[in-house]
């Protein structure tokens, strides 16, 4: 039985335990997680927030992170502007990027989710409204979600990963994680056993994410 960490990665934290920069080093996972032998299963950009999975099992790591398995990943995306039905439809059908057409996705507008305030806060332009959408993709190109919305003319302001496969961000605040037991024959579905939530940092918001 493998172990899997579900971690709510805060904004501006690297999805790795070390920073290769000789100067101006960035915050890494080592500031939050002290579990020898655990490594990220996939990645989440420095300027994105939300669910990051880590495991001590190479087989499980491969099953989660391999593009061949096409595990769906769901994001809550705040964009600049009021995104129309035509843009939603194109996100679903595929968006032409420099590295090719994206796979079909699932996308729909959503109400603003009940989540923690970001630190530092998002910079808004007062004269321009914003929209939230839920976007589910099955591939992991570099900065894909941001490039998809930008190609539609709606830059991403805030990006939160809510779900990877059957695992979700529910009940986790930024910097918190849970340690789960996973039966490999059942993965990438959620584990059958789970420990209590572990606080790893005191700088938390006072509201938990809820599925809209």
List each language-model region with its residue ranges.
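Intrinsically disordered, Lys/Arg-rich low-complexity segments
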Residues: 191-212
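RNA pseudouridine synthases
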Residues: 1-189, 210-212
């Amino acid at each position: 039985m493998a172990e899997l960490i579900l971690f709510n990665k805060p904004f501006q934290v690297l999805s790795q335990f070390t920073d290769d920069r000789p100067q101006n080093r960035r915050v890494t996972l080592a500031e939050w997680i002290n579990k020898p032998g655990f490594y990220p299963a996939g990645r989440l950009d420095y300027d994105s927030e939300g669910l990051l999975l880590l495991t001590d099992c190479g087989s499980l790591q491969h099953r989660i992170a391999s593009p061949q398995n096409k595990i769906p990943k769901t994001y809550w995306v705040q964009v600049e502007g009021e995104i129309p039905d035509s843009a939603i439809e194109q996100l679903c059908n595929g968006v032409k990027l420099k590295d090719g057409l994206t796979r079909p996705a699932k996308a729909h507008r959503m109400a603003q989710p009940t989540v923690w305030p970001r630190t530092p806060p998002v910079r808004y332009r007062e004269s321009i409204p914003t929209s939230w959408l839920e976007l589910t993709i099955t591939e992991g190109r570099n900065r894909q979600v941001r490039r998809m919305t930008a190609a539609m003319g709606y830059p991403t302001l805030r990006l939160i990963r809510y779900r990877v496969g059957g695992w979700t961000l529910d009940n986790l605040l930024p910097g918190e994680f849970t340690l789960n037991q996973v039966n490999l024959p059942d993965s990438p579905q959620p584990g059958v056993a789970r420990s209590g939530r572990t606080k790893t940092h005191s700088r938390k918001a006072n509201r938990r994410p809820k599925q809209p």
